[in-house]
């Protein structure tokens, strides 16, 4: 008789992140919305400092969980589902996350926006709501995702939740040159943690842009999708290049040979923003501007 796989547990004996995701997604797959519902496209911004990421988890405060709670109050038994374009990690922010919301009760998009914002905490805001086709899917239809990372060259009293303050002097030109190595289709297994949600560690990076603006270094990474901690580890290794502790040769070695060393260079979540999610025929502005100025 075949034995069921044993669950993974964290060091404190609690269920691991991977098993929490498996349980949650199993529950999602067993509850399919009926055809008798309306679908709405939500444009969401949030300050992720207080949250354990986007995806709803048991016994954890999450962005999706907060919006689902508010939607349940508005639609009661008529609320069906809420799905985001992707998961942001604990502490990561969003300038424009996209989600679709399904409900059997038909309300005007602007009424939904106002009612949700009345119930949501101060650090989550629904910027806009649009009526969408039932065939629209926030995650599956997304063509491109864009992340912005902010590095601060100085200590800041007001912006510490929105930047990574790097005390060392950084060589911007070396960082910018090294960033181009990531463009294209590559195996990013050295730059991510194991994730049960992802079938492959290969990711297409369309572009990486960098810019110095005042006391900030801005890094924009544009790709088809991103795997767990990937963006923060790319930023972290670029900072090591800027410090003079790593080279382009080291990056190529990490990309060609799986290594656990990159994990220790993971940049903090505070400086990371989901900037934009693009769908068919949508284009990203070439302007690279700070999410929060300091």
Task: Indicate residue ranges for each PLM-predicted region.
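Structured-RNA-binding interfaces characteristic of tRNA pseudouridine synthases
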Residues: 2-294
């Amino acid at each position: 008789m075949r034995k069921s796989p044993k669950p993974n547990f964290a060091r404190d004996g609690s269920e691991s992140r991977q098993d929490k995701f498996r349980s949650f997604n199993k529950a999602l797959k067993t509850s399919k919305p009926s055809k008798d519902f309306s679908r709405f496209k939500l444009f969401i911004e949030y300050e992720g400092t207080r949250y354990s990421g986007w995806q709803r988890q048991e016994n954890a405060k999450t962005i999706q969980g907060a919006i689902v709670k508010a939607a349940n109050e508005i639609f009661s038994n008529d609320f069906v589902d809420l799905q985001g374009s992707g998961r942001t990690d604990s502490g990561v922010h969003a300038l424009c996350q996209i989600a679709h919301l399904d409900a059997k009760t038909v309300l005007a998009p602007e009424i939904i926006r106002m009612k949700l914002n009345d119930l949501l905490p101060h650090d989550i805001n629904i910027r806009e709501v649009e009526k969408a086709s039932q065939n629209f899917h926030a995650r599956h239809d997304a063509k491109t995702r864009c992340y912005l990372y902010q590095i601060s060259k100085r200590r800041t009293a007001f912006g510490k939740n929105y930047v990574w303050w790097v005390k060392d002097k950084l060589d911007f030109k070396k960082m910018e040159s090294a960033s181009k190595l990531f463009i294209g289709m590559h195996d990013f297994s050295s730059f991510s943690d194991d994730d049960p949600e992802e079938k492959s560690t290969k990711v297409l990076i369309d572009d990486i842009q960098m810019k110095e603006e005042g006391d900030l270094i801005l890094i924009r990474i544009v790709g088809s999708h991103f795997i767990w901690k990937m963006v923060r580890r790319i930023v972290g290794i670029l900072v090591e290049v800027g410090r003079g502790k790593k080279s382009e040769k080291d990056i190529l070695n990490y990309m060609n040979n799986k290594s656990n060393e990159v994990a220790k260079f993971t940049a903090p979540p505070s400086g990371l923003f989901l900037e934009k999610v693009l769908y068919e025929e949508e284009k990203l502005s070439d302007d690279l501007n700070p999410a929060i100025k300091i």
